[in-house]
Amino acid sequence: MIYKVFYQETKDQSPRRESTKALYLNIDATDELDGRIKARRLVEDNTYYNVEFIELLSDKHLDYEKETGVFELTEF
């Protein structure tokens, strides 16, 4: 399952929509909730990012992300 993780690069400042970034993770999970938990843990263990939101991408949404050219899987 591919998850899109929205985050701020620092926890020192309050989140601002203009500085929100995203990364994509391929997570082996039994269901959506398990995938969100694993994605959050993976990001928090490997970065200092402030995770805002984690979303499971549908096939259509994933195709759109690939078409826009911003899609790149992140590996830790």
Curated annotation (Swiss-Prot):
<dbReference type="InterPro" id="IPR009907">
    <property type="entry name" value="RpoY"/>
</dbReference>
<comment type="function">
    <text>A non-essential component of RNA polymerase (RNAP).</text>
</comment>
<dbReference type="GO" id="GO:0000428">
    <property type="term" value="C:DNA-directed RNA polymerase complex"/>
</dbReference>
<dbReference type="GO" id="GO:0003899">
    <property type="term" value="F:DNA-directed RNA polymerase activity"/>
</dbReference>
<keyword id="KW-0808">Transferase</keyword>
<dbReference type="GO" id="GO:0006351">
    <property type="term" value="P:DNA-templated transcription"/>
</dbReference>
<comment type="similarity">
    <text>Belongs to the RNA polymerase subunit epsilon family.</text>
</comment>
<dbReference type="GO" id="GO:0003677">
    <property type="term" value="F:DNA binding"/>
</dbReference>
<comment type="subunit">
    <text>RNAP is composed of a core of 2 alpha, a beta and a beta' subunit. The core is associated with a delta subunit, and at least one of epsilon or omega. When a sigma factor is associated with the core the holoenzyme is formed, which can initiate transcription.</text>
</comment>
<protein>
    <recommendedName>
        <fullName>DNA-directed RNA polymerase subunit epsilon</fullName>
        <ecNumber>2.7.7.6</ecNumber>
    </recommendedName>
</protein>
<dbReference type="Pfam" id="PF07288">
    <property type="entry name" value="RpoY"/>
</dbReference>
<keyword id="KW-0240">DNA-directed RNA polymerase</keyword>
<keyword id="KW-0548">Nucleotidyltransferase</keyword>
<keyword id="KW-0804">Transcription</keyword>
